[in-house]
Each structure stands twice: as structure tokens, then as C-alpha cells.
């Protein structure tokens, strides 16, 4: 069945007549150019005014990561525009990032993301990692798993993205920090590249893992550090 499980279900647990009523099924875009049957195995990240300071909207902004390597944002708020007077609607969703996943490179996102808001910057960061959880011991030099962090530059607003642009550039908007032990290559702080080049790569970071390593559980953000469980 094409697109098995590639949907976000909005369920009403407070409906007294029909408890657990499905209010909406939001189909997630299935990239036909990829050789992966898409699915959403992880728990969504849900941002509400109850859990986050400074939020003015009612409802929630929701984020999911999927098998195809996409990071998707959903508008479940009462906002009616994107801050630039462009109209938005309830249940709108847009792809923020594509990490170029394939069967060959094994970049499956089995596990949920963790998220946090910078104390000073107020930026929302989402953290995820990849690895075929059903074949943890499988080794192949073609495997190219990663762990990464991505910054939603529009938060706390919802802005529709050009998905053709997102799919085309993939991780090019993020900084490769694989061999960086000092932080010099991190987004917004790197001084190895020009200001123009830095601006093009300031939406996130990623670390390439050796072919023998896979992320085996969801990451954990604590006190400004992100911890990734790695199977080797």
C-alpha cells in the first residue's frame, strides 16, 4: 500500500459523545523520487502555550520526522496569517527539511525528535538522527547515517515553504560539523567561511557517522547539550 502510515492523525480525546474521534487525517507528502515507503513511526513534537513561554497563539505547532528523511511542520493554531499578511489555514503543513534519505544510505528516521528553545536566541531547534533500527548489525560502506539539529527560523509563526527548494537543497543549508571539536563550524558562529556562505548554512548542523554506527533511540536535550544513543 503506497504511503502506509504517512499521515498525522488529529484525535479529539474530549469529545463526550465519541471519545477518540478522529478530527482530521493530514496526509504527509510522499516523495515519489525516493525508493522508501514513507511512514511516521515517531511521536510528534507538539509546541503549545502550556509548555512554552511567550507563545501567543492558541492550539499547537506540530513537527514530525519521517522515513523519507523529511521534517514537516503543521499548523494546528488559531493563527490566520504568517506574520507577513499571507493567509494560512488550520491543518496547513509544509516541509522544512529533507536529509536525502534512501535505501542505499540507510537514513531511516525510526525515532522521535527532541526539541528546545534557546535561552538567549529564542530559536526553536529540533534534533534527530538516522539508522535502520530493524538491521542494527548490518554494515555496508554505502551507509551514511547522520545526527543533526535544525532551526525553525520562522518560529513561533507558521510560514509556508517552497518544497521544491527544500527538496533540491536538502542539507546544503546546514553546516557540516563532523570534524569540528571546537564549535568553529557551528551555524551562526563559524568564521571559516564568508558572511554570505555562513548565511546559507545557518539553519542547522549535521554530523556524519561512520558506516558501523546507527542512532538507536531518540536524542535527549538537557542543559544545552544533546545526547544521542549510538549503536556500533
Residue positions per predicted region:
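Beta-propeller fold recognition
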Residues: 1-232
Amino acid at each position: 500500500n503506497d504511503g502506509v502510515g504517512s499521515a498525522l492523525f488529529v484525535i479529539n480525546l474530549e469529545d463526550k459523545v465519541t471519545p477518540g474521534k478522529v478530527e482530521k487525517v493530514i496526509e504527509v507528502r510522499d516523495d515519489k523520487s525516493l525508493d522508501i515507503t514513507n511512514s511516521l513511526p515517531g511521536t510528534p513534537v507538539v509546541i503549545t502555550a502550556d509548555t512554552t513561554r511567550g507563545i501567543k497563539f492558541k492550539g499547537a505547532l506540530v513537527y514530525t520526522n519521517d522515513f523519507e528523511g523529511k521534517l514537516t511542520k503543521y499548523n494546528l493554531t488559531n493563527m490566520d496569517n504568517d506574520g507577513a499578511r499571507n493567509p494560512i489555514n488550520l491543518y496547513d503543513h509544509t516541509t522544512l527539511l529533507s536529509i536525502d534519505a534512501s535505501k542505499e544510505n540507510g537514513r531511516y528516521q525510526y525515532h522521535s525528535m527532541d526539541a528546545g528553545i534557546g535561552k538567549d536566541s529564542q530559536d526553536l531547534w529540533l534534533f534527530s538522527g538516522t539508522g535502520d533500527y530493524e538491521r542494527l548489525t548490518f554494515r555496508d560502506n554505502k551507509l551514511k547515517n547522520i545526527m543533526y539539529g535544525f532551526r525553525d527560523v520562522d518560529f513561533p509563526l507558521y510560514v509556508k515553504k517552497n518544497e521544491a527548494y527544500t527538496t533540491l537543497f536538502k542539507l546544503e543549508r546546514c553546516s557540516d560539523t563532523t570534524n569540528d571539536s571546537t564549535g568553529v563550524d557551528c551555524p551562526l558562529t563559524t568564521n571559516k567561511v564568508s558572511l554570505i556562505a555562513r548565511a546559507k548554512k545557518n539553519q542547522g548542523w549535521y554530523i556524519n557517522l561512520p558506516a558501523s554506527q546507527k542512532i538507536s533511540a531518540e536524542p535527549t536535550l538537557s542543559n544545552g547539550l544533546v545526547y544521542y544513543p549510538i549503536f556500533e
